[in-house]
Structure formats: structure tokens, C-alpha cells
């Protein structure tokens, strides 16, 4: 039974701290932010995670899992390629407020911050981004094979454009505190 309590404690720490890391960034999140938010001591935090890097990784994985789950659910719910691509945009529209309230897109946040300071997180962000792109490319190619999507559409280029539009929309909305830009970008995809 102690194992279950330990796992519950870890889960609670991650769920509490994940939005803080996403909002403030890895570098700017102080141990006092973590202990104040969780009500736990430094020893309790490090007893569960060993170091700040392990906690940050667990929090990043938690934040990204929400978006990955949305992608998987969208792909599973829609048989056609066009519906999959449209469904993913709908997922982002419906969950924009949740993502925004948690500090924005965790992938973009970590990618920007890690580029300058932390190769491990940069590599993790790169892997997730490339996997996301690969999924979109596969959907486009399936659509081309079934005749839904024009064969002259360059799948790699469109996937980059699609991701950049979503991420750029989030960035613009977050920076200007105006979600209208995000919704307009999504609507025009």
C-alpha cells in the first residue's frame, strides 16, 4: 500500500506543478514555487523525484499527454483524412481555453526555452514535434490515396504549415491576450 500512496503523491505533485512549469518555464520556476504550490517540503519533492530535472520532465510529459491524447482520439474518431485534419482543429478550438489557462502549448514553450539552455528538453520537444508532423503527413498521404486530398499537395510542406498555423495562432493569442487571432487562423485553415 505505501507504493500506492507514493504514486498518488507523485501524481498530485505533477498535476499541481505542471501548469507552473508551463507558465513560468523550467529556468524561472524556483523550488519555492514548487513547495508553495504543493505544500510539501523540499525533501518531500526530491524524495519523490530526485531532482528538479526529473520533476520538470514528468510535468512536461503530463502537459504534452493531454495534447497527444487529443490527437489520438481525433484520429480514432474520424475515418476520413479531411475529417481527421478538421477534427484536430476542432480539438484545439474546443480546448483553447484549457491550454491557454495552463500557460499555452507546452511543446512550444519547452521548445523555445530549451533551445537556449537544455539539450535534453530540446531533443524531447523535437521528437514530439517530428512525430506530430509524421502523423499529419500520414493522414495527408492516406487522403491522397483515397482521392480526398489533391495529389499535388506536398504532404511534408502542408504538415509544417498546419502545425505552424496552430502554434503561431496560440503564440499570437497568448502574446496579445486576444484569442480572436487564434480562432481566425484556425477558421481559415
Predicted regions, residues:
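Base-recognition residues in the alpha-helical recognition helix of bacterial helix-turn-helix
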Residues: 22, 47-50, 58-62
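Hydrophobic/aromatic residues within well-ordered alpha-helical segments
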Residues: 52, 63-67, 81, 88, ...
Amino acid at each position: 500500500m505505501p507504493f500506492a500512496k507514493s504514486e498518488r503523491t507523485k501524481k498530485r505533485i505533477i498535476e499541481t506543478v505542471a501548469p507552473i512549469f508551463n507558465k513560468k518555464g523550467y529556468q524561472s520556476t524556483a523550488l519555492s514555487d514548487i513547495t508553495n504550490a504543493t505544500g510539501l517540503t523540499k525533501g518531500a519533492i526530491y524524495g519523490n523525484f530526485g531532482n528538479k530535472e526529473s520533476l520538470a520532465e514528468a510535468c512536461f510529459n503530463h502537459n504534452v499527454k493531454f495534447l497527444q491524447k487529443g490527437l489520438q482520439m481525433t484520429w480514432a474518431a474520424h475515418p476520413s483524412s479531411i475529417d481527421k485534419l478538421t477534427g484536430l482543429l476542432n480539438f484545439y478550438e474546443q480546448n483553447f481555453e484549457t491550454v491557454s489557462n495552463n500557460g499555452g502549448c507546452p511543446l512550444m514553450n519547452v521548445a523555445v526555452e530549451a533551445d537556449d539552455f537544455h539539450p535534453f528538453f530540446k531533443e524531447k520537444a523535437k521528437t514530439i514535434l517530428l512525430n506530430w508532423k509524421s502523423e499529419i503527413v500520414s493522414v495527408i498521404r492516406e487522403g491522397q490515396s483515397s482521392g480526398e486530398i489533391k495529389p499535388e499537395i506536398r504532404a511534408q510542406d502542408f504538415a509544417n504549415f498546419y502545425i505552424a498555423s496552430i502554434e503561431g495562432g496560440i503564440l499570437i493569442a497568448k502574446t496579445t491576450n486576444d484569442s480572436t487571432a487564434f480562432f481566425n487562423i484556425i477558421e481559415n485553415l
